[in-house]
A protein has these predicted regions:
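Conserved structural motif at the start of ABC-family nucleotide-binding domains
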Residues: 3, 18-20
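The feature captures the beta-strand-to-loop junction immediately N-terminal to the Walker
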Residues: 34-36
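ABC ATPase nucleotide-binding domain helices that frame the ATP-binding cleft
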Residues: 42-45, 139
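Helix-to-loop junction immediately C-terminal to a conserved catalytic motif
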Residues: 49
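Conserved coupling/switch loops of ABC nucleotide-binding domains, chiefly the family-specific signature
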Residues: 55-58, 206
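Conserved ABC transporter NBD signature motif
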Residues: 57-65
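ABC ATPase nucleotide-binding domains
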Residues: 75, 81, 85, 90-226
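Glycine/charge-rich catalytic "coupling/switch" loops of P-loop NTPases
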Residues: 247-297, 322-358
Length: 358
């Protein structure tokens, strides 16, 4: 299915929920809608599904205008944050329902396959009311996958799941999407989820479409400060700077010898540095930034250390478990070639060169 939105906007009363935008999804691929709460992800999905109509603009499916077509006439599967299951039917019957409507063969085998992939095979004989919220959400997700609709819309489908299960299911979902032929739209607030799912990413902020493209490209070359903020977890370190003759001068810090395009080589700049680009051991060509430890926390297999420095507050993401004394002096090292530079208006002026395989 080729879904395209042309000059879509949505107003409710005096409020604008979606500003004018164009978005053409890639058929058979995953498109992630990435943005904070109230970025416009759900509003956009409801228009895609036919649950809402835009105030202006058109919705096209394979070139045909379906803007006013009700949802019941569209072949769409949608999973909401708030799961919806048939309460009087067992888990197995819930998952099997779209398969039976299509008259498919080997229904039991397909139901069990999906249940196993989503870790709910032990609940097949239970009713939804006997399950936890996270388990019910997985039932709704399995039913949507079973439907095999040409357009599948998933609105933060893992929001009710615990951290460990989310990590397990992300890879499973990526494989399930790749194995199917549906055009998938997946809304999330988590950059890590977008990176794992791959495909394409549309970054939304307060109803505006900021950037759309291949996920890796959007992550590595955010077109603006707003995109960089939305597509960074932990947040990108953003530091005030000035253009200099041979590069960028950090305010209160070292000179970064990097090339800037002529139109960005003057005035106030912002340097962006991902937390993973900072380290505590120097490599050839690195520059040092000195400060003191404000906070250190371990999350999973990484350590996050927050430091107060002359160039501003910095957060470094270090692989492995590291121990730091609060208030202790700390030297963080960075490779100038790994910095982003944004112009005075927030537009991207420079991005690090991508390494092979990234």
């Amino acid at each position: 299915m080729q879904l395209a939105l042309e000059n879509i906007s949505k107003k409710v009363g005096a409020q604008t929920w979606l500003y004018d935008m164009d978005l053409a999804l890639h058929s058979g691929a995953v498109t992630v809608l990435l943005g904070a709460t109230q970025a416009g992800k759900t509003s956009l999905m409801r228009i895609m599904a036919g649950l809402d109509t835009p105030t202006a603009g058109r919705v096209l499916v394979d070139g045909a205008d379906v803007t006013g077509m009700p949802v019941r006439e569209r072949n769409v599967a949608m999973v909401y944050q708030q799961f919806i299951n048939y309460p009087s039917m067992t888990v197995a019957a819930n998952i099997a329902s779209p398969l039976k409507l299509r008259g498919e063969k080997h229904i039991d085998a397909r139901v069990r396959e999906l249940a196993e992939r989503l870790h709910i095979d032990m609940f097949l004989k239970r009713l939804p009311a006997e399950l936890s919220g996270g388990q019910q959400q997985r039932v709704a997700l399995a039913r949507a996958l079973a439907k095999g609709a040409p357009l599948m819309l998933l609105d933060e489908p893992q929001v009710n799941l615990d951290y460990k299960l989310r990590e397990e299911l992300r890879e499973e979902l990526s494989q399930l999407f790749a194995a199917g032929q549906s055009t998938v739209v997946y809304a999330t607030t988590e950059p890590a989820e977008a990176l794992l799912l791959g495909g394409y990413t549309a970054v939304l902020d307060e109803g505006r479409l900021l950037q759309y493209g291949p996920t890796a490209e959007v992550f590595h070359r955010p077109c603006s400060l707003d995109v960089a903020r939305a597509f960074s977890d932990p947040p990108m370190n953003l530091l005030p700077a000035q253009a200099a003759t041979s590069g960028v001068q950090l305010q209160g810090g070292p000179l970064l010898v990097v090339h800037l395009p002529a139109e960005s080589a003057t005035g106030a700049l912002t340097v962006g540095l991902r937390a993973s680009a900072l380290r505590v051991q120097a490599r050839p060509g690195d520059l040092a930034v000195h400060g003191t430890v404000e906070l250190a926390e371990i999350s999973g297999s990484d350590t996050f250390v927050h430091a107060s420095t002359a160039v501003g507050s910095l957060v470094a993401q270090l692989t492995g478990v590291h121990h730091f004394e609060l208030g202790a002096p700390l030297a963080l090292y960075l490779d100038p070639q790994q910095v982003y530079v944004f112009g005075e208006g927030g537009q991207l002026a420079r991005a690090p060169e991508r390494r092979k395989g990234n």
